[in-house]
Amino acid sequence: MNNKYNYKNLKWLWLSILIMLLDIGTKYWVKTHFWIGEVLSVLPGINCYYVCNPGLAFGLFTNASLYYRWLFVWIITLVIVAFIIALYKLIERPKCYSISYSMVIGGALGNLLDRILYGAVVDFIDVHIKNWHWPTFNVADIAICIGITIVTIRFYYDFIKNNLY
């Protein structure tokens, strides 16, 4: 019998849960030790800056109505489900796909919980060089970005390898 699904890939959901718990824990620490808008210099160019982002990544749609904010919740939920299904269906793929999908799932779950519970995502990592500031982010955002970067690089590598050789 040919099984077209790989249950073994679901074992990587432990990484999703770990990332989600780390994200929740760091956000809880920030919320219990800082006032909104408070800044603490951690290292040169890195601050702990407690902000709440009701919009999407990079502050997009910050002024969106409540209707659109809940629409984002549903869309993000569907994306998480799609990544879990994709993880489940990965067959004969390098392990980095499972790891990267799990990172995206964990990060998305962490930010989704904030949206549902508080109506906004808690961000607190502020990176800057002189007057240039990267948008404030959190542990979930780091996991999502690393996960997407890994799968993009690997996908590109596989594409080149399969089409040039």
Curated annotation (Swiss-Prot):
> Which keywords does UniProt give here?
Aspartyl protease, Cell inner membrane, Cell membrane, Hydrolase, Membrane, Protease, Transmembrane, Transmembrane helix
**Which organism is this entry from?**
Blochmanniella pennsylvanica (strain BPEN)
What EC number(s) does its UniProt record assign?
3.4.23.36
Catalysed reaction per UniProt?
Answer: Release of signal peptides from bacterial membrane prolipoproteins. Hydrolyzes -Xaa-Yaa-Zaa-|-(S,diacylglyceryl)Cys-, in which Xaa is hydrophobic (preferably Leu), and Yaa (Ala or Ser) and Zaa (Gly or Ala) have small, neutral side chains
What biological function has been recorded for the protein in this entry? This protein specifically catalyzes the removal of signal peptides from prolipoproteins.
Active site annotated at which positions? Answer: D123, D141
Task: Quote the pathway field.
Answer: Protein modification; lipoprotein biosynthesis (signal peptide cleavage)
A Pfam family hit: Peptidase_A8
Its membrane topology is listed as: Multi-pass membrane protein
Q: Does the keyword Nuclease apply?
A: no
Return the NCBIfam families for the record: lspA
Question: At the top level of its lineage, which domain of life is listed?
Answer: Bacteria
| Any GO CC annotation of this UniProt entry | plasma membrane
Q: Which gene encodes it?
A: lspA
Entry annotated with the keyword Flavoprotein: no
Where in the cell is the protein located? Answer: Cell inner membrane
InterPro entries named in the record: Peptidase_A8
HAMAP family recorded: LspA
Q: Which GO terms describe its biological process?
A: proteolysis
Segments spanning the bilayer are 10-30, 42-62, 71-91, 105-125, 133-153
Enumerate the GO terms in the molecular function aspect.
Answer: aspartic-type endopeptidase activity
Name the chain's protein. Answer: Lipoprotein signal peptidase
